[in-house]
């Protein structure tokens, strides 16, 4: 009888322990979660929306940070909202952060305010990675001025190491952009952003140009540009591709014929997202 009781106790303990382990495993499967307008700084513009996938973990869940365009003076994270479901469908295991940043005016938020906001947003996400149950592997995806901020962050700063960059028609040489534009309004925007010209403020133009910070350690980069872009000439992306290539950095450049700046038809956007998905899967492990 004594032995039977002991066996029953052991069996009961084993059963309870097994149930406890199964319960713990169930608890660890986190549901999908969306957090809107999360502040990463004290300014009202320093906010982001965060999309966390189900089943995420600090070991396996990588992060895509999306940075909207708008010539550094306009635009909003809402501009990228249409692309969130597309990325979630293609890369379902990724978390996504869609960020706002301070926009420049003639009297405030001159560069490098936007660069500093990028750093602050990334640092916030890294600090909160444990709470969000995401890893510290980051992909930056930006369009136009947002792509400029993405490449500048990735190339200029060794830490944190950015895993990959997706660059939609972003400028990378600010002096060349200023000097080559045939649109007076664009020149005035750059003067307002930089609080000067390449002649009056050469150091800031140099320090704000991603092309100047490319090294053989730079992040893998995929670039998309239209050959009829009059806002950011395709020469900017060609120059970036040439420098990345010369230094042995993994890169791809796709130039779409007869396409301008910002608005591309659905078939081209689908092609770009196909290529983006493949590039990220290949280069971010």
Residue ranges of predicted features:
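C-terminal catalytic histidine-bearing segment of alpha/beta-hydrolase fold enzymes
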Residues: 238-285
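Short amphipathic alpha-helix adjacent to the substrate-entry channel of hydrolases
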Residues: 78-98
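Short beta-strand element of the alpha/beta-hydrolase
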Residues: 60-70
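Conserved alpha/beta-hydrolase "acid-adjacent" motif
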Residues: 230-236
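N-terminal cap/lid segment of alpha/beta-hydrolase-fold proteins
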Residues: 22-57
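Short beta-strand/loop motif that positions the catalytic acidic residue
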Residues: 217, 222-225, 229
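Mobile cap/lid helix-loop segments that gate and shape the active-site cleft of serine hydrolases
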Residues: 176-213
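Primarily recognizes the serine-hydrolase "nucleophile elbow" in alpha/beta-hydrolase
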Residues: 120-180
């Amino acid at each position: 009888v004594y032995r039977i009781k002991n066996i029953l106790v052991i069996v009961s303990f084993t059963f309870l322990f097994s149930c406890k382990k199964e319960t713990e495993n169930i608890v660890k499967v986190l549901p999908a979660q969306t957090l809107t307008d999360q502040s990463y700084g004290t300014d009202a513009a320093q906010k982001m929306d965060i999309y966390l996938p189900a089943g995420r973990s600090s070991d396996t869940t990588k992060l895509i940070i999306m940075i909207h365009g708008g010539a550094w003076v306009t635009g909003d994270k809402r501009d990228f909202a249409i692309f969130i479901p597309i990325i979630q469908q293609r890369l379902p295991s990724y978390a996504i952060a869609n960020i706002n940043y301070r926009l420049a005016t003639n009297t405030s938020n001159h560069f490098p305010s936007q660069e500093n906001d990028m750093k602050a947003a990334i640092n916030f996400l890294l600090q909160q990675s444990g709470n969000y149950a995401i890893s510290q592997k980051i992909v930056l995806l930006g369009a136009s001025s947002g792509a400029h901020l993405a490449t500048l962050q990735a190339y200029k700063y060794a830490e944190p190491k950015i895993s990959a960059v997706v660059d939609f028609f972003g400028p990378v040489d600010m002096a060349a952009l200023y000097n080559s534009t045939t649109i007076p309004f664009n020149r005035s925007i750059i003067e307002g952003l930089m609080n000067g010209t390449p002649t009056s403020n050469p150091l800031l133009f140099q320090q704000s140009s991603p092309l100047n910070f490319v090294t053989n350690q730079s992040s893998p980069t995929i670039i998309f540009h239209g050959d009829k872009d009059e806002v950011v000439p395709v020469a900017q992306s060609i120059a970036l591709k040439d420098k990345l290539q010369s230094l042995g950095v993994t890169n791809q450049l796709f130039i779409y014929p007869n396409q301008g700046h910002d608005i591309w038809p659905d078939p081209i956007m689908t092609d770009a997202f196909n290529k983006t998905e493949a590039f990220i899967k290949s280069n971010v492990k």
